[in-house]
Amino acid sequence: AMLSACEPSVKAPEAILPVPEQKQIDWQKMETYAFVHFGLNTFNDREWGYGDTDPATFNPAKLDCEQWVKTFVAAGMKGVIFTAKHHDGFCLWPTQLTEYCIRNTPYKEGKGDIVGELAAACKKYGIKFAVYLSPWDRHQANYASPEYVDYFHKQLRELMTNYGEVFEVWFDGANGGDGWYGGAKDTRTIDRKNYYNYPKIYEMLDELQPQAIVFSDGGPGCRWVGNEAGFAGATNWSFLRAGEVFPGYAK
């Protein structure tokens, strides 16, 4: 036994596949967290809003974000993602970039900020907070133009600087199609790989929220499994082709 204890330790083998970043390991250890999909559509029986729904229809008078978070904690969840803006373009924080937001609703007489209320509740009860921000915007007249990309980046910067630490940023892969677009009511297409300038977005996130995992069907932190049934490959479910795949461009 003493001889075996004196034997030199065996060097660990070199990695033959990409190894995860520490923040990816930390994300895996979270195990289970909630996703709250809430907004104008909640009050208008829609899954995807067209971009023309009247903000006056949004008035969750009895909303209590602390009640939400206490429920998540009781269920053993370690965080929550919230839809700050879905494809309809309606913003659940009082953004300074568009009037199509919570400031122009009856909720708290235009003084509400559900992104802020939920972030504060998460901090109070000790769970992590994250945001979903749809790149596609069926409300904005300038969607599919370079001007919209600047608008989208500025929205993301607002969310990343005003609500404390986030553990994840979720970008949806649904991009381009028919929409209200400021009254144009037409169909628009984009170059899904290049339009949003994701390399610049990743630089912003590394600067403002370096601990945050980026989720999309192209990662780069964690990716959509490829279907909505919950099935994944046994050995390669978390591999990503960095620099080749992007949100909305998973080819």
Residues of each region from the PLM?
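C-terminal motif of bacterial Sec signal peptides marking the signal peptidase cleavage site
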Residues: 3-5
